[in-house]
UniProtKB/Swiss-Prot annotation:
It comes from the Bacteria. GO terms for biological process: carbohydrate metabolic process; cell division; cell wall organization; lipid glycosylation; peptidoglycan biosynthetic process; regulation of cell shape. It is found in: Cell membrane. Belongs to the glycosyltransferase 28 family. MurG subfamily. One of its GO terms (molecular function) is undecaprenyldiphospho-muramoylpentapeptide beta-N-acetylglucosaminyltransferase activity. Keywords: Cell cycle, Cell division, Cell membrane, Cell shape, Cell wall biogenesis/degradation, Glycosyltransferase, Membrane, Peptidoglycan synthesis, Transferase. Gene3D superfamilies: Glycogen Phosphorylase B (3.40.50.2000). The keyword Transmembrane helix does not apply. Pathway: Cell wall biogenesis; peptidoglycan biosynthesis. This is UDP-N-acetylglucosamine--N-acetylmuramyl-(pentapeptide) pyrophosphoryl-undecaprenol N-acetylglucosamine transferase. GO terms for cellular component: plasma membrane. It catalyses: di-trans,octa-cis-undecaprenyl diphospho-N-acetyl-alpha-D-muramoyl-L-alanyl-D-glutamyl-meso-2,6-diaminopimeloyl-D-alanyl-D-alanine + UDP-N-acetyl-alpha-D-glucosamine = di-trans,octa-cis-undecaprenyl diphospho-[N-acetyl-alpha-D-glucosaminyl-(1->4)]-N-acetyl-alpha-D-muramoyl-L-alanyl-D-glutamyl-meso-2,6-diaminopimeloyl-D-alanyl-D-alanine + UDP + H(+).
């Protein structure tokens, strides 16, 4: 907890999934790089990935009750007011204990109570804490839409996400904050080490496959189903199938390996080992894959409101990847479309260059500077 008011105190709220947590932690790192005396505290829930990711990155984590916002009318709507009150109450305790100067929200289960708790409360008995909102997705969620109405600054990855500050037609477009270990990655320099780490051959094309932190059955089935074709074409595979899934791919005698793992904890090495990737198109995934300049086959999650396809469109429009519908991804597609790409170094190089050009490598630092500026303006008026 922060009792020294000469020290900047920042609350980052973005728990639940890696897509909310990683941008928050990237901004936290960037704030510390600018002001190493700053205290950054993360809000999260007991059931989110933040219980692992936040401590690993060295930041204090304060848990609050989650507030899932149903997209459609369900019985959960009846429970929502009570959940919100409990979560806001707990969040206010954290804001007071840390002496928070600014709240930075990235959407997710903890963002809404953070936005509400930062307000002055009934009869304006509390100090108002300024809010900065960052929307990573191409279509904003409910929490960030509510937060944007109260925010000092509203930032977004792409135009037209549906959030903006008062008096503006759109958010400030900065891209998605990505950790420095990814934006500064030199894939070619790490290639030999990365391939040795995973037991992949030093030469020849490598296909990276992952479906998010929990894997993706359709990606698993399509790529493993093309294992013989991939091996025959001399393509090695690094495939993260998800901790709840299994993948048994017989080794091809004399052929390149098909390395199947539940989870990839060293994404920097995975990206460095690969020549192309098949993956979902969550906002954070698209940001990282484009930042490192990897050609990608994006397979949007076939649920929700089509946000994942929207996330991938800018990179695809720039020529850095392609989109294939989940239902169209098959072993045949891998054999007929992905293998020829992996066997074409010139096309891989061109797509990689275009992907890198579509990314925003400085987003974390830019967001951090805005957060510090917003906090300074408020601190100066106290």
């Amino acid at each position: 907890m922060n009792g020294d008011k000469s020290t900047l105190s920042v609350i980052v709220a973005g728990g639940g999934t890696a897509g909310h947590i990683e941008p928050a932690l990237a901004v936290a790192d960037a704030i510390k790089a600018i002001d190493d005396t700053a205290v950054v505290t993360a809000l999260g829930t007991a059931r989110g990935l933040e219980t692992t990711l936040v401590p690993e990155r060295g930041y204090p984590l304060e848990l609050v009750p989650p507030v899932p916002l149903p997209r459609k009318p369900t019985l959960d709507l009846l429970r929502l007011p009570g959940r919100v009150r409990a979560s806001v109450r707990r969040t206010r305790e954290v804001l007071d204990a840390t002496g928070a100067d600014v709240v930075v929200g990235f959407g997710g289960y903890v963002a809404l109570p953070a936005y509400l708790a930062a307000g002055p409360g009934l009869l304006r008995r509390r100090r108002r804490i300024p809010i900065v909102v960052h929307e990573a997705n191409a279509s904003a969620g409910i929490a960030n839409k509510i937060g944007a109405r109260r925010a000092a600054r509203v930032l977004a990855a792409v135009a037209g996400s549906g959030v903006s500050a008062r008096g503006r037609s759109d958010a400030e477009i900065l891209g998605i904050p990505v950790r420095a270990s990814i934006t500064g990655l030199d894939r070619s320099a790490l290639r030999a080490e990365a391939r040795a780490h995973f037991g992949l051959p030093a030469d020849g094309p490598v296909l990276l496959v992952f479906g998010g932190s929990q894997g993706a059955r359709s990606l698993n089935e399509a790529v493993s189903g093309a294992a013989e074709s991939l091996a025959a074409a001399g393509v090695a595979v690094l495939h993260a199938h998800g901790p709840k899934n299994t993948l048994d791919v017989p080794a091809a005698p004399g052929g390149p390996p098909y390395v199947a793992v539940p989870y990839l904890s060293r994404m920097d090495l995975a990206y460095s080992a690969a020549d192309a990737v098949i993956c979902r198109s969550g906002a954070m995934t698209v940001a990282e894959v484009s930042a490192v300049g990897l050609p990608a086959v994006y397979v949007p999650l076939p649920h929700g409101n089509g946000e994942q396809e929207l996330n991938a469109r800018p990179v695809v429009a720039a020529g850095g990847g392609m989109i294939v519908a989940d239902g169209d991804l098959s072993a045949g597609f891998v054999a007929e479309t992905v293998i020829p790409l992996l066997r074409d170094p010139a096309q891989l190089e061109d797509m990689g260059r275009r992907a890198a050009g579509a990314g925003h490598r400085s987003a974390a630092a830019e967001v951090a500077r805005i957060v510090i500026d917003v906090a300074a303006q408020t601190r100066g008026t106290r």
